[in-house]
Amino acid sequence: DYTKCKFSDGQDLQGSFLPNSNLSFASFIQVNLDKSIMMNSNLAFGTFSESSFIRANLYESTLTGANFEQSNFTSANLTRADFMGATLIDVNFQNSNLMEANFTSSNILNANFEGANLIGATWTNGEVCGPDSIGTCNK
């Protein structure tokens, strides 16, 4: 349980095995979590700005209200991840799997969804993305 922990900026934690972890309210600024296994984890209301999650597995993780400004989720598994109310400014989701992810009330600005699978995802306005939602949420 790492609830409310503040980690030193710029930590290299790539390849970490952290499934079912509680990282709510934690601070991980500029942290490298590439290729990490973090499925079913709770990152709610944490600060993960400028962090890297390339090819990380965050399947069914809770990311509600967290700050991911300028973070990189390229090719990450974010299936059924809950981003409700999260800050997603300048985030890179290129080629990531966001199937059935929840973006309700999230602040998405200048994010890159090129090649990302958004099928069945719930968009910021509550509408569900249709079957042709690759790279963009099509109703």
What is the predicted role of each segment?
Residues 1-139:
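Tandem repeat scaffolds
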